[in-house]
């Protein structure tokens, strides 16, 4: 797909999401870095390399924590650990399934449990907003996981954040 998108760009076809945007969002840590460098609010994020020092993690993040693989979409590779024991189990699973893995840990944002906002920005201007909401008490709100999309009123904060993030 990447080759097709780049080819369309070379032909001058207007795309909503170009190759640069897609490359950026495919790497969750890189996306966090770009947002943080722009002084936009992001959850505290740690990149973990094998072997992981769980005591060190516990000192730097409060539980629960969100565990993410660096790439992935549709909520795949995203887990929540309520405590150190669960984190240890998830880390062991990552070690078994992907030797030399990289994962990120993020502080859990309580207000976002089971919901998030998707903001459509076109040419630097917010064109629409949707709340994704879990329908089964999952902390993830992905529509592909059964969540639903609900139209959401665009506020000044959403207008500003959407424009800055784009």
Residues of each region from the PLM?
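Phosphate-binding site of ATP-dependent enzymes
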Residues: 80-165
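Residues within well-ordered alpha helices
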Residues: 7, 34, 57, 164-166
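Aromatic/hydrophobic pocket-lining residues that form π-stacking "cages" and hydrophobic walls in ligand
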Residues: 4, 54, 162
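A short, GP-enriched loop/loop-strand-helix hinge that lies immediately N-terminal to
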Residues: 1-26, 41-44
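Active-site nucleotide/adenylate-binding loops and adjacent lid/helix of ATP-dependent enzymes
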Residues: 22-106, 113-114
């Amino acid at each position: 797909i990447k080759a097709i998108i780049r080819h369309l760009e070379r032909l001058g076809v207007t795309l909503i999401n170009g190759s640069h945007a897609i490359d950026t969002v495919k790497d969750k840590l890189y996306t966090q870095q770009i947002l943080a460098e722009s002084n936009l609010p992001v959850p505290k994020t740690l990149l973990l390399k094998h072997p992981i020092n769980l005591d060190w993690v516990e000192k730097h993040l409060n539980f629960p924590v969100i565990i993410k693989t660096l790439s992935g979409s549709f909520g795949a590779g995203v887990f929540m650990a309520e405590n150190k024991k669960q984190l240890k189990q998830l880390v062991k699973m990552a070690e078994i399934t992907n030797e030399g893995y990289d994962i990120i840990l993020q502080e859990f944002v309580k207000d976002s449990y089971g919901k998030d906002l998707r903001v459509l920005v076109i040419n630097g201007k917010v064109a629409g907003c949707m709340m994704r909401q879990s329908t089964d008490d999952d902390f993830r709100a992905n529509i592909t996981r059964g969540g639903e999309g609900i139209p959401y009123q665009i506020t000044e904060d959403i207008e500003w954040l959407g424009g800055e993030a784009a």
